[in-house]
Amino acid sequence: MELPVNSFDKKEASTLTVADSAFGSEYKEGLVHQVVNAYLAGGRAGTKAQKTRREVSGGGAKPWRQKGTGRARAGSSRSPLWRSGGVAFAAKPRDFTQKVNRKMYRSAMASILSELIRREQLVVVDSLKLNEPKTRELKESLKKLNLGNVLIIIDGDDRNINLASRNMVGVSVCDALHVDPVSLVAAENIVVTVDAVKRLEERLS
């Protein structure tokens, strides 16, 4: 398939031939949901820990005798029913990692990119270079594309673009080798350079 390559004057400059497997696949909602959830789960620390009644310090002595006080019977002051007691079904550290194999991950990424193209939320530009790390220069370039919140995907690390975008609200920059499914799903619009498209195609092939 062919993608239109835009210049920053919003005119169609040329076209870029890309693989259907990477940018023209069908949208697999179930797979995308699974991969996004697995990615988010992998970012969880899993360090939450609470104490059960046996782990809370104290509570060894019976608070009062079994009968004759008129109060409900109690065997320990560390019961989950009591203030400062243990927690019933206390949370323990655990690993939230979900297994996603490489084929599933690549298929989900291709599915997301293809859907973004169909919805016209992905714009390919010939290049994005800044002479200096100036926010004004980057803002003027993006303004020509008439986009709102945007994720910029570039090939490699561009110091000028990274510095220029740091204090721009709604603008984030990512390298094509490290872009993740959550960033793609969350983005309102995506600007990709031609070099980044080729890198994504290599990555998903």
Curated annotation (Swiss-Prot):
Q: Which gene encodes it?
A: rplD
**Tell me, how does this one assemble?**
Part of the 50S ribosomal subunit.
Q: Which GO terms describe its cellular component?
A: ribonucleoprotein complex; ribosome
Q: Which organism is it from?
A: Coxiella burnetii (strain RSA 493 / Nine Mile phase I)
Q: Provide a GO biological process annotation.
A: translation
Q: Which residues form the signal peptide?
A: none
Example GO molecular function term? rRNA binding
Q: Which residues form a coiled coil?
A: none
Would you identify the family this protein belongs to, as annotated?
Answer: Belongs to the universal ribosomal protein uL4 family.
The job of this chain, per UniProt, is described as: One of the primary rRNA binding proteins, this protein initially binds near the 5'-end of the 23S rRNA. It is important during the early stages of 50S assembly. It makes multiple contacts with different domains of the 23S rRNA in the assembled 50S subunit and ribosome.
The opening ranks of the lineage are: Bacteria, Pseudomonadati, Pseudomonadota, Gammaproteobacteria, Legionellales
Q: What keywords does the record list, in alphabetical order? A: Ribonucleoprotein, Ribosomal protein, RNA-binding, rRNA-binding
Specify where the region named Disordered lies, as residue ranges: 44-79
Query: Is Kinase among the key words of this record?
Result: no
The yes or no answer to whether the keyword tRNA processing is present is: no
List, alphabetically, the InterPro entries matched: Ribosomal_uL4, Ribosomal_uL4-like, Ribosomal_uL4_dom_sf
- Please report the name of this protein according to its UniProt entry: Large ribosomal subunit protein uL4
